[in-house]
Curated annotation (Swiss-Prot), chain A:
Component of the Mediator complex, a coactivator involved in the regulated transcription of nearly all RNA polymerase II-dependent genes. Mediator functions as a bridge to convey information from gene-specific regulatory proteins to the basal RNA polymerase II transcription machinery. Mediator is recruited to promoters by direct interactions with regulatory proteins and serves as a scaffold for the assembly of a functional preinitiation complex with RNA polymerase II and the general transcription factors. GO terms for cellular component: core mediator complex; mediator complex. The keyword Nucleus applies. Belongs to the Mediator complex subunit 17 family. It comes from Bos taurus. This is Mediator of RNA polymerase II transcription subunit 17. InterPro entries: Mediator_Med17. It is found in: Nucleus. Pfam families: Med17 (PF10156).
From Swiss-Prot, chain B:
This is Mediator of RNA polymerase II transcription subunit 18. It comes from Bos taurus (Bovine). The gene is MED18. The modification Phosphoserine is found at residue 66. Belongs to the Mediator complex subunit 18 family. One of its GO terms (biological process) is positive regulation of transcription initiation by RNA polymerase II.
Amino acid sequence: MSGVRAVRISIESACEKQVQEVGLDGTETYLQPLSMSQNLARLAQRIDFSQGSGSEEEEAAGAEGDAQDWAGAGSSADQDDEEGLVKFQPSLWPWDSVRNNLRSALTEMCVLYDVLSIVRDKKFMTLDPVSQDALPPKQNPQTLQLISKKKSLAGAAQILLKGAERLTKSVTENQENKLQRDFNSELLRLRQHWKLRKVGDKILGDLSYRSAGSLFPHHGTFEVIKNTDIDLDKKIPEDYCPLDVQIPSDLEGSAYIRVSIQKQAPDIGDLGTVNLFKRPLPKSKPGSPHWQTKLEAAQNVLLCKEIFAQLSREAVQIKSQIPHIVVKNQIISQPFPSLQLSISLCHSSNDKKSPKSATEKQSPEDHLYVLEHNLHLLIREFHKQTLSSIMMPHPASAPFGHKRMRLSGPQAFDKNEINSIQSSEGLLEKIIKQAKHIFLRSRTAATIDSLASRIEDPQIQAHWSNINDVYESSVKVLITSQGYEQICKSIQLQLNIGVEQIRVVHRDGRVITLSHEGQELQDFLLSQMSQHQVHAVQQLAKVMGWQVLSFSNHVGLGPVESIGNASAITVASPNGDYAISVRNGPESGSKIMVQFPRNQCKDLPKSDVLQDSKWNHLRGPFKEVQWNKMEGRNFVYKMELLMSALSPCLL
Amino acid sequence: MEAPPVTMMPVTGGTINMMEYLLQGSVLDHSLESLIHRLRGLCDNMEPETFVDHEMVFLLKGQQASPFVLRARRSLDRAGAPWHLRYLGQPEMGDKNRHALVRNCVDIATSENLTDFLMEMGFRMDHEFVARGHLFRKGIMKIVVYKIFRILVPGNTDNTEALSLSYLVELSVVAPAGQDMVSDDMRNFAEQLKPLVHLEKIDPKRLM
């Protein structure tokens, strides 16, 4: 409302009665005072609503009071009102204008209320200040400045706030993106090492060696999962990797193939599951991600399983004299009598710890790492073979298959030739052969070593070749006497150790084949050593100028040796006076006899026949030398001393 | 002289009746390289092989209307490989469930005097051609991509001329009869070659 002063309205007349007219005689005619209602109606008509007043409340209160006064006629008045509106009869009722005005005011108030409530939400409508020009010029410029400053500050603050909000949003997004990106880059790295494919919304990988030629039916699939169970707000641990792999439960943990050779075959009833002895999990290589080690371990388990499956299949299929036994996770075979080769698959899962394995510790020496390694090599060779055996047919229309197989018809192969195409040695056969060879080699080495340490006199030397085949290795055995290595080189043996037997090649080209039994080799070496002594005497005689009268490697006389034969030699001194006879047997040892000239024998009975002095040059009887009482550190040295003692002084 | 009787009984290879499942398509010369590239990725991991084959088609006409056809094929680039004699039966289109053309098939490896033998039997050479191309394998599926060359002078395989500007692509499996499952595998494989080549079962009767 404008600030115009309100007109005071009094509803009571100052005087009681109004003068209507003053007569000429000075008499006043009074108007009859208005009744209460008439007065009210008159006053009400005089209210000008378009002109506000300062005493609105008062007026409103009055009006209300009036309305209450008129409450009795309310209902009828309402009706009248309606009629009045309809009939357009103004002033039918004294409060008509008041009512109309109040009504319109109410309407406006309602509208104003609605508008305000809408404006308050700031959704559909906002209040904009009218341009400054509209303001009356008399506005205070300082206020204006203040308001404008306030406004611009508020605007700046809003811009800043918006910027901050955007920044926080982008920071959180970045963090999320970083994780996402890390996952993708990890996936890329994974992709470089492993075969992956997408199936539905999953990413599956291939652990199997199928692309390398494996025929193992295990699918070997692992699943690539996104590691999302980490809270973004918390600190990310060091080893956190956004990519994780889920491997099949049967490939978890670590596994290896254990090959061992035992001397005695245990009772089959005792055979049980081979216990694991624990191996520390392979440490992940620095720099390689955590999934790489996990997948490599799983792939190793898969390969071990494949090896074992292949071996057990062959063990059942192969017909051998002593059947191979497959019990639980163990394959038992007997390469040699009283020798047992056991191949077992040890698989430990990480979570399941068996307390038994800790107590029962296997001795590591019967654990053949070489064979285990070779098994891995063999299975890979096998894979390669299956890959390379797939040959493309030529001409192109021909069916797949081996070329020689297709040639068999046109070239009329016989059964043997066809069999030779098909036959291929299995993994088990190969590994048994290797085990036999390894066993034979170690037994040979043990035999030679024990002989060398037990027997001092002829010395035995073994020179093992460094480069061996898996099925063959060789050793050179030299038998010498200490101090006489240069002259006593008669016995040089080349031992070729194969799978089933040992071939011995002499220096002169003779070949002897020995079986796998260790005793045979030992007996052979013992007889060679005893022969060596006799050979040494022969060599020594040459050097000393003695004459060899007789020499025999195998003497048919004397006591029978249990091993081999005794050998003997007889040498005569340069002037022929003395003769030394040596008989050496592997078991009986050496027996040395010296023959003296006849004239030196005092106790010789005089013979009637040999009267002449010329017969004195005949040799006399033999006398045995007490060999163990001789000076000298070994046989050849003693012999040298004996020979020099019997030789005449040349000076 | 009376022509030898020609049996019209279905020819079977031994005890097992083998069938060839076949899908065919073709690519233009310029898109050969991308197809080869794709096949190398899809097929078994081995070095891709090329081949040059000489095929001769022999006919034996009897009283019946349709002659008996045998195909003799030899490799020109591999010495020592046996000749290949092949009988192919009438192709069956089959219904929609079978995704490949099926025909009876007998494969025999023979010695090199096959032509003389066939001539003696009364066969007559109908036509010959040289096929030159690439060979792939995926499991039991064989994929051959080759171009057919016309032989200008009969018998001289060095003097040839390309028949078309495109390569023939064949996806085939030889399996015992009734194993229609292989056709599903073939369909799946053909799907993977889709934008490069469309392998379909093509009824040769409709082309004639």
